[in-house]
């Protein structure tokens, strides 16, 4: 006996679709080319820094040498001044006359000519 009016309920099947897994590729935050450029830039900055420091040190050493030479020049100038003063003291006419009289020389006023420099 078949009942044509009878239709069995069909079970609703929920089709479980397989979830698509999205694979997210993690990119490096910095690419290899950027890393190379960064390293080259850091090396350039380091090189320039070392160059600047070395030039500053050379200038410092030169300044020290200049100061030493200036001190030496000033001491030489002082010594020259002292020697000029002693030359002036030793060449005074009165001193020369005293030494001449001490050694037995006589001054004859008629034969003496006074020469001024």
UniProtKB/Swiss-Prot annotation:
**Induction description:** Transcribed at a low constant level in all growth phases. Part of the mraZ-rsmH-ftsL-pbpB operon.
What are its GO biological-process terms?
FtsZ-dependent cytokinesis
Where mainly found?
Answer: membrane
Where does the sequence pass through the membrane?
36-56
| Entry membrane topology | Single-pass type II membrane protein
Q: Which residues lie on this side of the membrane: Cytoplasmic?
A: 1-35
Q: Which cysteines are joined by disulfide bonds?
A: none
Post-translationally, this protein is described as follows, namely:
Cleaved by RasP. Cleavage is important for turnover and function of FtsL.
Task: Determine the domain of life of the protein's source.
Answer: Bacteria
UniProt keyword list = Cell cycle, Cell division, Cell membrane, Membrane, Transmembrane, Transmembrane helix
- Extracellular face: residue ranges? 57-117
State any further remark. Answer: Is thermodynamically highly unstable and is likely to be rapidly degraded unless stabilized by interaction with other septasomal proteins.
Function per UniProt: Essential cell division protein that may play a structural role. Probably involved in the regulation of the timing of cell division. Also required for sporulation.
Q: Which family does it belong to?
A: Belongs to the FtsL family.
What is written about domains in the entry's comments?
Answer: The cytoplasmic region is involved in protein stability.
Q: What is this protein called?
A: Cell division protein FtsL
Q: Which organism is it from?
A: Bacillus subtilis (strain 168)
